[in-house]
UniProtKB/Swiss-Prot annotation:
Tissue: Expressed in respiratory cells and sperm (at protein level). Highly expressed in testis. Up-regulated in hepatocellular carcinoma (HCC).
Assembly description: Microtubule inner protein component of sperm flagellar doublet microtubules. Interacts with BRCA2. Interacts with the CCT chaperonin complex. Interacts with HSP70. Interacts with AK8. Interacts with CFAP45. Interacts with DNAI1. Interacts with IQDC.
Name of the protein this chain belongs to: Cilia- and flagella-associated protein 52
Localization: Cytoplasm; Cytoplasm, Cytoskeleton, Cilium axoneme; Cytoplasm, Cytoskeleton, Flagellum axoneme
KW Repeat (keyword) present: yes
Pfam families (alphabetical): WD40 (PF00400)
PROSITE patterns per UniProt: WD_REPEATS_1 (PS00678), WD_REPEATS_2 (PS50082), WD_REPEATS_REGION (PS50294)
Gene name in the database record: CFAP52
Protein's organism: Homo sapiens (Human)
Record key words, sorted: Cell projection, Cilium, Cytoplasm, Cytoskeleton, Disease variant, Flagellum, Heterotaxy, Repeat, WD repeat
Additional note from the record: May be a good candidate as a diagnostic marker for HCC as well as a potential molecular target for development of novel therapeutic drugs.
Source superkingdom: Eukaryota
Functional summary from the UniProt entry: Microtubule inner protein (MIP) part of the dynein-decorated doublet microtubules (DMTs) in cilia axoneme. Important for proper ciliary and flagellar beating. May act in cooperation with CFAP45 and axonemal dynein subunit DNAH11. May play a role in cell growth and/or survival.
Amino acid sequence: MDNKISPEAQVAELELDAVIGFNGHVPTGLKCHPDQEHMIYPLGCTVLIQAINTKEQNFLQGHGNNVSCLAISRSGEYIASGQVTFMGFKADIILWDYKNRELLARLSLHKGKIEALAFSPNDLYLVSLGGPDDGSVVVWSIAKRDAICGSPAAGLNVGNATNVIFSRCRDEMFMTAGNGTIRVWELDLPNRKIWPTECQTGQLKRIVMSIGVDDDDSFFYLGTTTGDILKMNPRTKLLTDVGPAKDKFSLGVSAIRCLKMGGLLVGSGAGLLVFCKSPGYKPIKKIQLQGGITSITLRGEGHQFLVGTEESHIYRVSFTDFKETLIATCHFDAVEDIVFPFGTAELFATCAKKDIRVWHTSSNRELLRITVPNMTCHGIDFMRDGKSIISAWNDGKIRAFAPETGRLMYVINNAHRIGVTAIATTSDCKRVISGGGEGEVRVWQIGCQTQKLEEALKEHKSSVSCIRVKRNNEECVTASTDGTCIIWDLVRLRRNQMILANTLFQCVCYHPEEFQIITSGTDRKIAYWEVFDGTVIRELEGSLSGSINGMDITQEGVHFVTGGNDHLVKVWDYNEGEVTHVGVGHSGNITRIRISPGNQYIVSVSADGAILRWKYPYTS
């Protein structure tokens, strides 16, 4: 039996329907395009272009690692994005053509990380700032797609520069700022040199987080970690004023934008969005948002603007009434699980750190958010009758919520010693089976008002990673990171069969006819096992590079899907054991994957907080 992956030529590509995700940790990562119709933001290694009104998405893919900064030219013709990479390796800057959504050039000089990027006002030059291991500033010619010159970004006795901004009127002047350094640079094109002038702040010592410049270049403003704003004159290189004197912005001024009509939009690390004016910087208008503000981008002249926060929220704010509207949101941490309710593909639930969210499948809208502060949810399942969402938490509790309102229905305290790591429900809605970090599998009897422990099954030596229940509720299979899969008899509550392999099992599935199971894990192999006697039927090479973390099988049992640390979604033919389709789009490790009831979609979730929806390639 041939267990090799068939040649790539025969493998079709999976069609990506939609992406739910936004990396809010990238400073000034959210941008509004000058056409005022699209917003551009990073997610993992991808740059997303999304229509604000129609929500239509395009993807710019080309980075080999996470995108760390983003810039857009004033004309809107070009997008530049920089990435992080491993120590000592070159980090790429990619120049994109916005109109055709294609890669124009790859600019490689910096090492380790690209800290910040800025375009000159007439699209002549791009300036880039290297990360802490690189420490240089480079000016690139956009026409020639080549470096003009470079220089160390900061002096010897100060910290790193982390922010860069171009002058609004002149193509030859830009400013950099960072830890104890503020510099104004002049580009000398005939001699291919850049000349810095250190700005004088007197006794003030500040670490700059954000930078903004007036439309006429008369002043530039620096937001600091101290929570105040420095106003500098680029001609005299002197400090004009500093404020506010009292009530500084909590957790620093993390985003700053100058408005054409005068005044500043300021975002703080504590999520406060403020409109204020120099020299007092007292709040004239303010609103509190969720998560530290990392981006403020104007839509047009600033009558409306978009705000991005660390908790991956994108808000639209109109200047006149200063009220926020949440237009996009997603998980800001690794997504641990995804599940569809029985028999419907209209909605699905995901869980991550702090919360469980229920999404509308076709529109990508968040319908419900259930928050439990400072806890992580490792697994979720819908009861078959749709009356509750059962969830497994790292504080050792099993919590049940109402799916329409998010109301807490009941809690099973101390369900497991080292956190609950996996959970499943029976189709008669009378039992919940949970697995813990210590390796115990526990069967709970769920009544109208009571939750009773029926049995604790102690066989596994390490955490339980996945539980699947047979359709008749008389048997279930649990996979564990101790290298065993155990098939349990749920009537007599004892072990039926044990499967051993030299791997950390991450996922397991029953074939719909329920005489075989398929497993996978860190050894990258997909194994088919006989349920009756636990013998291995066949093994396939599931991935060439990383662990397989998620797996699901269709209701007919003809195809199954896998996803893992190689960031690829693969569709397999069950009988042939061959890959038929591959989906490329994830930037983080895929943690779980599901096929929707009715085989319309495949939904995969990953460690970078992204949820990707793929079109199922076969018609059922």
